[in-house]
Amino acid sequence: MMVTVIGAGSFGTAIAQVLSWNAEMVRLMARRSEVVENINRTRENSAYHPGVKLRDNIEATLMDGSVLEESEYVFMAVPSGNLRSIVRSMNSSLEDKKIVSCIKGIEHPGLKTMSSVIREETGSRTVFSISGPNFADELIRGMTSGITVGASTRYAREIAGLLKSPRIILDHSENVEGVEFCGILKNVYAVAMGILDGQITGENHRHSLLTLCFREMNLILNEMGYGELHDRFCGFGDFLLTSTTDKSRNRTLGLMLGKKMRLSEDSTITIESLRSIRAIRELTEGLELPVLEMVYQTMQEPENVNLYIREFQERISRPEF
């Protein structure tokens, strides 16, 4: 089977390497010709994974819908803010494909998951998602990783066949958007743990805050009808990894906010995090979510972070009973 990965960034390249063990050929689509030429010439994506050799059955190519003709499955790994325009540019080539979103983000305004955007633009009825606690630099090196496949059982088995490896642990949910929603939420709460890091007095404190964050995330999942996903790789696993590890871009963003460091307002991670936080806040209007509110206020007025942390600490110190 031939498979295409759209997006030759860090995760797109990593998932292409994973897929290459089971697919006959993997096409890795990039936007820039110099990236395509460099990957095919050196067998590396030196911008993201220097020193990691890509397998011989991975071929880089420019983004062009005609390249998709022979592919049964297409994995999407592009920034969430660019997804709609990229899909729109090749939608007639995607309408009969099985499409797997690897993207952790939400469209705002519009409040649509990535699979919803893909379905809307292509008309495809076979759109799925994968998510889990996966840093791309470990995934591409074959280190053990857990992935949740969001698809009906029939298609989940096909996707599992493409991902299978002694070092890939899979679980499954038929709730495609729920799997995606976990990936959106965990990013928000990873920012929270980063913001609060400077206030943590010890491990008791750290894990109490982790519990509060996960409880709040669970409350939102239940409210959205996705409560069964909290113990999947896309739920607890991804939350724990992203909230406690300094390799996490969202946790790092929170650390910078907590230290009042100047942020680049046009950086991808800042834009995507703010988009996700605003979207979740709109979707959960009416719920009492002190962690989310603290993150939202801090992102809006980072110079007042100490005030918002103090208000949050006062709120959580009041007994719930």
From Swiss-Prot:
The active site is at K186 (proton acceptor). It comes from Methanothermobacter thermautotrophicus (strain ATCC 29096 / DSM 1053 / JCM 10044 / NBRC 100330 / Delta H). The keyword RNA-binding does not apply. Its EC number is 1.1.1.94. It is found in: Cytoplasm. Sn-glycerol 3-phosphate binds at K104, G132, K186, D238, S248, R249, N250. Pfam families: NAD_Gly3P_dh_C, NAD_Gly3P_dh_N. This is Glycerol-3-phosphate dehydrogenase [NAD(P)+]. Its main location: cytoplasm. Glycerol-3-phosphate dehydrogenase (G3PDH) is generally absent in archaea, because archaea, unlike eukaryotes and eubacteria, utilize glycerol-1-phosphate instead of glycerol-3-phosphate for the biosynthesis of membrane lipids. Surprisingly, the genome of the thermophilic archaeon M.thermautotrophicus comprises a G3PDH ortholog, most likely due to horizontal gene transfer from a eubacterial organism.
